[in-house]
Amino acid sequence: MEENNLQCSSVVDGNFEEVPRETAIQFKPPLYRQRYQFVKNLVDQHEPKKVADLGCGDTSLLRLLKVNPCIELLVGVDINEDKLRWRGDSLAPFMGDFLKPRDLNLTIILYHGSVVERDSRLLGFDLITCIELIEHLDSGDLARFPEVVFGYLSPSMIVISTPNSEFNPLFPSVTLRDSDHKFEWTRMEFQTWALYVANRYDYSVEFTGVGEPPAGAENVGYCTQIGIFQKNGGRATEACVSEQHDQHVYKAVFTTSYPSLQQERFFKLVLVNEVSQQVESLRVSHLPRRKEQDGEQGDKPKDIGGSKAPVPCFGPVFTEVEKAKIENSPKPFCVGDKFFVPLQRLLAYPRLNRLCANEEMMRSVIADSIPLSSDGSAVVTDLCNYFDEQFEF
């Protein structure tokens, strides 16, 4: 396993935390990446639909989380409006997101505002993260922070990370790791605060961290300490959330939505493309066998399914169960110079089966884009085309 930190001339974090240019500890991967990966692992485990990052800064964590398929609403809040506007475009969908839409809708919103202000648009969230945030709050804001985040917003889970001051003596000439930090807590101080807050607002909490100490200094604990708070009894009910009065104090500075299969136009584009590709693959694979059969069966329909289950040279690899399902489905056939692929055959392929629940659904979506047989039970295409002749299929 790769070492988590090295002795070298560098900074603590590679992101925000300042250390004099002397011999210092460099974490590998950098400490900020370890923190973000910790959150991503939690998201992978718990699959929250609505996630907010308070004090989102340059939106690095949001950019890491936006690829997670379970998230449908991703929100960032920060006091620095210029930074939000500058980094907002990095959260917008790229061309690849349109070519391969997500399964579920995703909306991303960046709000300018203070984390100690109440805004009802953040009610009912599954996860709220506060990564290296609380140490930037003055005493007044720190006192209000639990009332807003734990009491008012009351999400199912809250993750709070903060520097562990017991680790600081391992850095040269460090009192506070950042000039903007108002305080840095020992493990006992953080855990005392966290347990008090958890007890007051009906949460349970467990403690961990990232940034392991070097050999011989294990007693100082992690460089970054983390509290994972979970609401006792699960998430707030929709009824409880709806009882809250609307309070919109934050200013939305960036909003974007991602294409998804839940949106009719993108679902149709994906389904038509998948059907077309599968039909073309079956047609091309039939051409060599067609030449062998020519002259033997006249103009009668020819079953060209073959005796073996499909094993593509490129593309998806099927399990034995999937192969059996495909092989047992109605087989493609030819009538004259036309090639027919039954919709039931197409539905046997995993990717198409995942998109469509049944034959009727597939037919209704593709009917105005792909030619179908007279009874609508199969896709129809020309058996041979210009390109086949050019490449001598």
From Swiss-Prot:
Predominant localisation class: cytoplasm
Record's cofactor remark: Binds 1 Mg(2+) ion per subunit.
Binding site for Mg(2+): 132, 135-136, 181
The species this protein was found in: Macaca fascicularis
Pfam families: Methyltransf_23
GO molecular function, one term: small RNA 2'-O-methyltransferase activity
Region feature Disordered, mapped onto this chain: 283-309
Keywords: Cytoplasm, Magnesium, Metal-binding, Methyltransferase, RNA-binding, RNA-mediated gene silencing, S-adenosyl-L-methionine, Transferase
Job of this protein: Methyltransferase that adds a 2'-O-methyl group at the 3'-end of piRNAs, a class of 24 to 30 nucleotide RNAs that are generated by a Dicer-independent mechanism and are primarily derived from transposons and other repeated sequence elements. This probably protects the 3'-end of piRNAs from uridylation activity and subsequent degradation. Stabilization of piRNAs is essential for gametogenesis.
Subcellular location field: Cytoplasm
Record protein name field: Small RNA 2'-O-methyltransferase
GO BP term (any one): RNA methylation
